[in-house]
Curated annotation (Swiss-Prot):
Coiled coil: none annotated. Keywords: ATP-binding, Endonuclease, Hydrolase, Ligase, Nuclease, Nucleotide-binding. One of its GO terms (molecular function) is ATP binding. Its EC number is 3.1.21.-, 6.5.1.1. This is Replication-associated protein ORF2. The lineage of its organism: Viruses, Monodnaviria, Sangervirae, Phixviricota, Malgrandaviricetes. It catalyses: ATP + (deoxyribonucleotide)n-3'-hydroxyl + 5'-phospho-(deoxyribonucleotide)m = (deoxyribonucleotide)n+m + AMP + diphosphate. Plays an essential role in viral DNA replication. Binds the origin of replication and cleaves the dsDNA replicative form I (RFI) and becomes covalently bound to it via phosphotyrosine bond, generating the dsDNA replicative form II (RFII). In turn, viral DNA replication initiates at the 3'-OH of the cleavage site. After one round of rolling circle synthesis, protein ORF2 is linked to the newly synthesized ssDNA and joins the ends of the displaced strand to generate a circular single-stranded molecule ready to be packed into a virion.
Length: 320
């Protein structure tokens, strides 16, 4: 993916705060290059659908690397409310309650810590159902040793799901399902922030916005143990439901290495190389499409919006 509304950086010197000029016409950015400031470069806006899809893919990669560090006890957990435990806002709409999921995760981790098991991590999101806007939560748990799994009915595509008395003990507000954690389910959890309503919509409906919550350092252990090879190839190989795929190095790892790597010029070289490749790819796509840069971004926005509309729940949550 690529940013569909890149921001122009101008008059930027090393160490100075970044200033932006952003002129928009609808959903597509248009830049007035005749202004009396010097435009040096462009940076991602981090808000458009392209940036949000890139961000969700990065979380999928980081989750997959965390699984590689701890191959056992990784689960995709869905928590739902029973009718009597739904919390309604002033407009009579069922609402997510962040304190509920925070308390659940803290209680679960303390339970295992008292039994000598530490190092449980998570990636969680709150979400509203597509049809009835019913609140529920998805949590990717890493290194969570559930030993009381009970098999439930198979999903409609033939993959196994479970329940756990341990999960029920700490989530007493409704129901839950457990599946095997994969790149697909982690990416799906992160993509809920891509499907979100606009800020004004949440305020108008008085709903808690959909948001990601996570532990620190997801995927960091594997990265630190393999960083030389990863940067040599400048990519990460991940097993997905469509086979082995090559992904970009998550920006989180770049920021980490900027603080820790002594050879900062090497990292600058890698970033410059990436930028040249990205610009060349963009130029080639424009040539093929025979459209202006602005029109090209508009077309890409429409394509990505259609992708977001088709996002579905990952039924591949554990093979039989």
């Amino acid at each position: 993916m690529a940013c569909l509304r890149p921001l122009q950086v101008h008059n930027l010197k090393k160490g100075e705060k970044v200033n932006f000029k952003h002129y928009s016409n609808g959903d597509v950015a248009r830049y007035d290059m005749n202004k009396n400031y010097i435009v040096n470069d462009s940076v991602p806006c981090r808000k458009c659908v392209g940036c949000r899809l890139d961000n969700s893919a990065e979380w999928g990669v980081r989750a997959s690397l965390e699984i590689k560090s701890n191959p056992k006890h990784n689960w995709f957990v869905t928590l739902t409310y029973s009718d009597e435990h739904l919390v309604y806002n002033a407009l009579g709409r069922p609402n997510c309650v962040p304190e509920h999921i925070t308390k659940f995760i803290k209680s679960l981790r303390k339970y295992f810590e008292r039994r000598g098991h530490i190092g449980i991590k998570y990636l969680a999101s709150n979400e509203y159902g597509t049809k009835r806007m019913r609140p529920h939560y998805h949590i990717c748990f890493f290194n969570l040793p559930l030993d009381d799994l009970e098999k439930t009915i198979d999903s409609q595509k033939g993959y196994q799901q479970w329940t756990s008395k341990t999960i029920s003990r700490f989530w007493d507000k409704g129901f839950h399902t457990i599946g095997e954690l994969t790149y697909h389910s982690a990416n799906y959890t992160a993509r809920y922030t891509t499907k979100k309503l606009g800020v004004k919509d949440y305020k108008a409906l008085q709903l808690v916005p959909e948001k990601l919550r996570m532990s620190k350092g997801i995927g960091l252990k594997y990265f630190m143990e393999n960083k030389e090879r990863i940067y040599k190839e400048d990519s990460v190989l991940i097993s997905t439901d469509k086979g082995i795929k090559r992904f970009k190095v998550p920006k989180y790892f770049d920021r980490r290495m900027e603080r820790e790597w002594q050879d900062e010029f090497y990292l600058d070289y890698i970033k410059e190389k990436r930028e040249k490749v990205a610009k060349r790819t963009l130029f080639q796509r424009q040539i093929v499409s025979s459209r202006s840069y602005t029109d090209y971004l508009g077309d890409e926005q429409k394509k990505l919006n259609n992708i977001v509309k088709r996002l579905t729940r990952p039924l591949k949550t554990g093979k039989k």
